């Protein structure tokens, strides 16, 4: 079988059987299984990335335009995760794929798209977990200012300053980061340089 370049993975080629060839090592890459799906490790932009082989086949020989598109999923028509035939693969949105999976497994389709982002959520929910407002929590000692923190830490260090201001050291460091956008290490370095 003829190897064809993988558009979104320069230096790699694939054939219709799902063998992935590296031009860096001049070898066919070893496969391993991730959640029942055959996968390979590719070096993309200097980082090692696990890529499912059925996504590569669908990208090169099918309808998956972008190999790493998180909005599209590749479905095995016959539900056999090891069947990598390009005729057995189809590209679906997350919602379409969930509905097909529910139908294939005989489950009721109790999930609906979130009105804000479109990802699947339970029918009785108002929004999905991603769009649900996160609790803000209670701010400990809201009157604690950046000047108070800076003055005390430069004078006595984080531990003693926290004790003096009656908060934990981690609370003091988090408050400093929240107020300045800087790491607490910046203030520690300033103290050392005095």
UniProtKB/Swiss-Prot annotation:
UniProt-listed Gene3D superfamilies: 3.90.75.20
Molecular function per GO: DNA binding; endonuclease activity
Enzyme class: hydrolase
Domain of life, per lineage: Viruses
The keyword Nucleus is assigned to this record: no
Signal peptide (from-to): none
EC code: 3.1.21.-
Cited InterPro entries: His-Me_finger_sf, HNH_nuc
UniProt keyword annotations, A-Z: DNA-binding, Early protein, Endonuclease, Hydrolase, Nuclease
Induction and repression of expression: Expressed in the early phase of the viral replicative cycle.
Protein's job: Endonuclease that cleaves only one strand of asymmetric DNA substrates thereby introducing interruptions into the template or coding strand.
Name under which the protein is recorded: H-N-H endonuclease F-TflI
Encoding gene (name): hegC
């Amino acid at each position: 079988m003829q190897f064809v370049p993988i558009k979104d993975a320069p230096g790699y080629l694939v054939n219709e059987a799902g063998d992935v060839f590296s031009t860096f090592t001049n070898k066919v890459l070893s496969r391993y299984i991730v959640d029942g799906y055959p996968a390979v490790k590719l070096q993309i932009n200097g980082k090692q990335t696990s890529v499912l082989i059925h996504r590569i086949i669908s990208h090169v020989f099918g309808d998956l335009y972008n190999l790493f598109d998180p909005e599209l999923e590749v479905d095995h028509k016959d539900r056999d995760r090891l069947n990598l035939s390009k005729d057995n693969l189809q590209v679906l949105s997350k919602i379409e794929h969930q509905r097909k999976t529910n139908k294939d497994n005989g489950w009721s389709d109790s999930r609906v798209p979130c009105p804000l982002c479109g990802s699947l959520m339970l029918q009785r929910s108002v929004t999905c977990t991603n769009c649900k407002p996160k609790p803000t929590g209670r701010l400990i000692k809201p009157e604690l200012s950046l000047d108070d923190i800076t003055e005390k830490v430069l004078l006595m260090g984080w531990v003693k300053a926290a004790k003096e201001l009656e908060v934990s050291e981690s609370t003091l460091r988090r408050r400093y980061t929240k107020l300045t956008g800087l790491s607490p290490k910046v203030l520690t370095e300033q103290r050392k340089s005095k």
